[in-house]
Curated annotation (Swiss-Prot):
Transmembrane intervals: 38-66
All ranges on the Cytoplasmic side of the membrane: 1-37
Biased composition (Basic residues): 204-222
GO cellular component: extracellular region; host cell plasma membrane; membrane; virion membrane
Classification of source organism: Viruses, Riboviria, Orthornavirae, Negarnaviricota, Haploviricotina
Gene: G
Pfam families the record matches: Glycoprotein_G
Name the record gives this protein: Major surface glycoprotein G
Membrane side Extracellular: residue ranges: 67-257
Region described as Binding to host heparan sulfate: spans on this chain: 187-198
Length: 257
């Protein structure tokens, strides 16, 4: 349809241009015949016609350029975009586990907050407190420091109660006289009484003492070579010869000569 309308507009402009040509030729003929008044009126009308035609053509070309620049059909954004709250029909096991764990963590945190608000009563039994201690130790890591007593001396640390939401001071039962709150605190205090962990001292094994054995002193006697050659079953006479000095042997040898 747009091409057909442009073709019709082009035909009308062409016809108007031809008519203006014929009009100019007629005005020139009248000017030759000295008809000035008629020529002036005709020129003014021709000028008005040309101006209007130029304005019309300019508007047509501007409209055609804008129509070519703009797309004919705008894309719909709602068809391409998905809704934000869209839930997939397939509910996988991983999603179920993640939601289940998140629900458990929120319920445990709510229970711990309820425990902190019950700072003075503690009407629930001890089994529930122990179960909550175990759950809190398995899920929520705590980074709280032990409370400081007003006297300035800190109680010994109990390594089992690091993850508790609140630690209670030890209250002796002798001070409670008819107070239910004090008796409950006394019972919990007895359960939570700070017990010092046994200190393990590593004793070093004593080194074995090394005693030096006394060495036997051996006395070496000088003996002559003649005494070594004599047999063992000799009588006392040869033993005297063994113990005799070498000077005695030299004297005997001289007498024999």
């Amino acid at each position: 349809m747009s091409n057909h309308t442009h073709h019709l507009k082009f035909k009308t402009l062409k016809r108007a241009w031809k008519a203006s040509k014929y009009f100019i030729v007629g005005l020139s003929c009248l000017y030759k015949f000295n008809l000035k008044s008629l020529v002036q009126t005709a020129l003014t009308t021709l000028a008005m016609i040309t101006l209007t035609s130029l304005v019309i053509t300019a508007l047509i070309y501007i409209s055609v350029g804008n129509a070519k620049a703009k797309p004919t059909s705008k894309p719909t954004i709602q068809q391409t975009q998905r809704p934000q709250n869209h839930t997939s029909p397939l509910f996988t096991e991983h999603n179920y586990k993640s939601t289940h764990t998140s629900i458990q963590s929120t319920t445990l945190s709510q229970l711990l907050n309820i425990d902190t608000t019950r700072g003075t009563t503690y009407s629930h039994p001890t089994d529930e407190t122990q179960n909550r201690k175990i759950k809190s130790q398995s899920t929520l890591p705590a980074t709280r420091q032990p409370p400081i007593n007003p006297s300035g001396s800190n109680p010994p640390e109990n390594h089992q109660d690091h993850n508790n939401s609140q630690t209670l001071p030890y209250v002796p039962c002798s001070t409670c006289e008819g107070n239910l709150a004090c008796s409950s605190l006394c019972q919990i205090g007895l359960e939570r009484a700070p017990s010092r962990a046994p200190t393990i001292t590593l004793k070093k094994a004593p080194k074995p003492k090394t005693t030096k054995k006394p060495t036997k002193t051996t006395i070496h006697h000088r003996t002559s070579p003649e005494a070594k050659l004599q047999p063992k079953n000799n009588t006392a006479a040869p033993q005297q010869g063994i113990l005799s000095s070498p000077e005695h042997h030299t004297n005997q040898s001289t007498t024999q000569i």
